[in-house]
Regions:
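Short, Gly/Pro- and small/polar-rich lid/capping loops
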Residues: 59-93
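Helix-loop-helix
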Residues: 1-62, 107, 197, 206-209, ...
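Soluble non-transmembrane domains of integral membrane proteins
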Residues: 88-355
Length: 638
């Protein structure tokens, strides 16, 4: 190796070492990591100890078969583990139910957290009777870590709360207070839940009362662990997995997310405002009044054979005033990923305090999302407000979009007509210049276009305007919850695929079913391609283009087979309107008049003096032709 190679290796090594040095964690970060690891290990050890003691007490009570207090030695052990919280080790199992017009939640006595949530306005796929259940039993767990004044670390999920108060006011707002008692007089911890009369948002306040008597004096924050397993709610598991992901927003408004395709993990030292456990159409969002600190989040997919699709985990820290002078306030959003519903939570809210929950609805890239927000969603909401069937709504949206694009489509069809009129002359050029003289053929073709005043690229202009709208609908329809459960013809749910044939062995890139709307859309696309290609010029190079154009619809059949039937229905209707527009234009345009107009323009241009740029361009073309002829002669002499 030469000197430069050794220098290169040395520089690379220096960069690697320098990068490692600059990115190593600080002493404070290392200390925080060690504290978290130590506390987790200590919690696990003490949980095991408490569990063993609790099992001993239960076994003794069963042996004695009397409702007496445990023996003195076990009671002492229990007090040693739980300290003033020993009374909370025994209690009532079950849930307390709260409900309003939209949700029904169950708050568990053990742990004092929301253990069940149902959405009254929605049904699970294949169940037309029972409300959709977001989670139940052990699918959702919320746990807080407490440090006692004897430096014991306890977790709320192992302790029993009591229902201290439950009341509903005249407006239908319900309040429930779950209390964690101690053996110290007037010393307890309250979880206060507030359920408005007609909302998906549930308030949760953590209110200590004289807890400085039971907890460590230096305890100013508590760790929180929130885990949830997301059950499959939809027919199409593949799409549900694609849209299910963990998202979170920093204080300040920036939104980030974990991977929806594979297991992922994030360690965030920055303050976080909310964390969302998201499914395709529904979300559970935890919102902090202040912020979540030092947060670790994980997301992992389940095996395809499981009834669950994703598992989410969060470990974070919340500020806590143990004197109770200030409550720690949280909010739960338990509801649909409906754009307007989520956006309404930012109404009349100053910019810095906006939650931006509507970003949970994926609307595509910036320009595509912008089109969805200012055009597609308002138009969709308008037609839906008329009480129309969802199929008619999509039909009207297609018609409006086609009317908006009509001027551009007209210009494209006019350009196509000119190309069609020039087809005989283009065929003559192709016959005159064989494929071996491709450069001369292209020059003659461009000269014809220039003379006739035709631009072969002008037909692409409408596609430039149509493409963002097509992409906007591509993003909007599969995530529009209004399509969920809505039927049209043979499709029983427009939010998922409409299989008419199924089989057991998966076909690569296709799956185990055939969607009828997708098949119809493909057939109509082939018909449109055939009509379009009939108007194109011939030539050897166009034969390959034709095959490619016919291949595209077949590729769409594979691509859209798993997509929402509502999206395939939209593309089918859109293509049908396009074919009708093309045929009407073809029937109303006189090719002879177009040819006469082009000849008149050509004569007019021929009488006009060429611009300096046009003259220079023509001179360059002549020079290229001369050089090409000289090169050909030189090769023949050899």
């Amino acid at each position: 190796m030469d000197k430069n190679t050794w220098i290169g290796f040395a520089l690379i090594a220096a960069i690697v070492v320098g990068f490692s040095f600059l990115n190593r964690p600080s002493e404070e970060e290392l200390a925080e990591r060690k504290r978290v690891q130590d506390s987790i290990a200590l919690v696990q050890a003490q949980e095991l100890e408490a569990k063993l003691i609790s099992e001993q007490i239960t076994a003794q009570l069963q042996d004695e078969q009397v409702a007496t207090t445990p023996s003195e030695d076990l009671a002492l052990q229990l007090a040693a583990v739980y300290g003033p919280f020993a009374p909370a080790t025994q209690g009532q199992e079950g849930l307390i139910t709260l409900e309003n017009e939209k949700v029904r939640i169950g708050v568990a006595y053990r742990g004092g957290h929301i253990a069940k949530a149902e959405l009254k306005d929605y049904k699970a796929y294949g169940d037309s009777v029972n409300p959709l259940c977001l989670f139940q039993n052990d699918e959702n767990s919320l746990n807080f870590t407490l440090v006692t004044n004897t430096n014991r670390i306890l977790v709320t999920q192992n302790m029993y709360f009591t229902a201290a108060n439950q009341a509903t006011d005249a407006e239908g707002n319900t309040t429930l207070t779950m209390r964690l008692n101690t053996n110290i007089e007037d010393c307890y911890l309250d979880f206060v839940y507030t359920l408005p009369a007609d909302d998906y948002m549930v308030g949760m306040s953590i209110v200590p009362h004289n807890m400085q008597l039971a907890l460590a004096q230096n305890m100013s924050a508590m760790e929180m662990q929130w885990n949830q397993s997301i059950p499959q709610q939809e027919k199409g598991r593949k799409f549900e997995e694609r849209y299910a992901q963990l998202q979170y927003m920093f204080v300040g408004g920036d939104i980030d997310k974990l991977s929806e395709q594979k297991a992922d993990r994030a360690n965030e030292s920055a303050r976080i405002k909310w964390i969302a456990y998201k499914d395709q159409f529904f979300s559970t969002v935890m919102i902090a009044e202040d912020a979540f600190e030092s947060t670790t989040m994980e997301s992992a997919p389940f095996n395809p054979s499981s009834r669950y699709i994703k598992e989410y985990k969060t470990n974070t820290s919340l500020a806590l005033d143990i004197t109770g002078q200030k409550a720690t306030n949280l909010r739960y959003y338990l509801g649909p990923n409906h754009y307007n519903t989520l956006k309404a939570y930012d109404k009349d809210v100053i910019s810095v305090e906006k939650l931006h929950l509507n970003e949970l609805v994926p609307l595509g890239w910036k320009i595509v999302a912008w089109i969805n927000k200012i055009l597609v969603i308002p138009m969709f909401d308008l037609f839906m407000s008329w009480g129309l069937h969802i199929g008619l709504v999509i039909l009207l949206m297609t018609l409006v979009i086609k009317l908006i694009l009509l001027p551009f489509v007209f210009a494209s069809n006019k350009s196509t007509a000119k190309m069609r009129v020039l087809k005989p002359q283009l065929d003559e050029i192709n016959a005159k210049y064989p494929p071996e003289k491709m450069q001369e053929r292209q020059q003659a073709t461009m000269a014809l276009y220039q003379k006739a005043g035709v631009s072969p690229m002008s037909g692409c202009l409408p596609m430039l305007f149509q493409f963002p709208i097509l992409m906007a609908m591509f993003w909007f329809l599969p995530t529009a919850i209004e399509l969920r459960g809505q039927s049209l013809f043979w499709a029983d749910d427009l939010s998922t695929y409409d299989a008419i044939i199924t089989w057991n062995t998966p076909i690569p890139l296709f799956g185990t079913h055939l969607s009828l709307f997708c098949l119809i859309m493909t057939v109509v696309n082939i018909v449109y391609t055939h009509i379009t290609m009939q108007q194109q010029s011939g030539g050897q190079e166009m034969k390959m283009m034709r095959w490619m154009m016919y291949l595209m619809p077949l590729m769409f059949l594979f691509f859209f087979n798993d997509y929402a039937a509502g999206l395939s229905y939209y593309y089918f209707v859109s293509l049908l309107f396009t074919i009708i527009q093309t045929m009407i234009f073809r029937w109303t345009v006189d090719d002879k008049k177009v040819l006469a107009e082009m000849e008149a323009n050509a004569k007019k241009k021929g009488s006009q003096k060429k611009s300096g740029f046009a003259a220079r361009l023509e001179a360059m073309q002549r020079e290229q032709q001369r050089l090409a002829r000289e090169q050909a002669k030189a090769q023949m002499k050899r």
